[in-house]
Amino acid sequence: MSATLSIQTDLVYATTPAGELRGDLYRPAGDGRFPLLIAVPGGAWRVCNRAKWRDWGEYLAGRGYALFAIDYRTATPQRTAFPEAPCDLLAAIRHARGNASTLSVDPDRIGLFGASAGAHLAALAALAPEHRAFEASKSLNGFGSIAAHVKVLVGAYGIYDLFRHWQDDLALNPPPDGNVVRNLLGCDPFDNQQRYVDASPLRQISYAANKVSALIAWGGDDEFVNPAQSEIFVRALQQARFNVRTHKAVGASHFWVNHALSDPLGHSARFAPVLAEFLDSFL
């Protein structure tokens, strides 16, 4: 471990009926009040690997930021993950704010950084932390009375309109293969339209939430998540008078955020200074 880097692994941030949830904290070494990004892994809401965020943790710590990469509850054939997954993320925000002194983070400078399904969850938490569907998040740790708002949202190739992604995934994976949105929500949109509305960040955009600054990134050649998901989301944020920055990774497909930052020609490395400038300005 670098003398300038502190890494704490397997920190428990919530206890759920399915077990404990943990995260890994990367931050500059020594005492301080470092601005914090909570990293939300992707994985089609089926898998969640926080270890993939180590590169970003080390990079951001080198720039004076902390990063808390978390696990959350995922969907299985026997269990949906909505509203559980966004509840877990909100619990992580409350945990970080409630333990700010112990973790050496600034409770007033917390943001979210998600990729793919993680960007979906991050957007939901940033836009609608007090949504009635997420009330259970307050009982997952001892910080239920603490606010779960954030200052910034960073979303990479996210899913923001679940009805549209349900349609796109149906075309890519026709029956009998499982539809990832159906696995998440436990229903089709024609079974329960309101559930799709509640779970879609696009439908949670409001003037009341526009104090959150957003950086939305996507790959121009993404074969798993339609780039229109990000483009339409950005347009709606702008219409609601959010402060929005964008980054289109020309020629990139999916997964590029978790490619090695050591490759100077990689899309992840090219995104790094864009992210750093955004955080320096708004977090």
Model-inferred region functions:
Residues 16, 127, 135, 139, ...:
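Mobile cap/lid helix-loop segments that gate and shape the active-site cleft of serine hydrolases
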Residues 49-56, 68-107, 263-268:
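Catalytic nucleophile-loop/oxyanion-hole region of alpha/beta-hydrolase
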Residues 1-32:
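N-terminal cap/lid segment of alpha/beta-hydrolase-fold proteins
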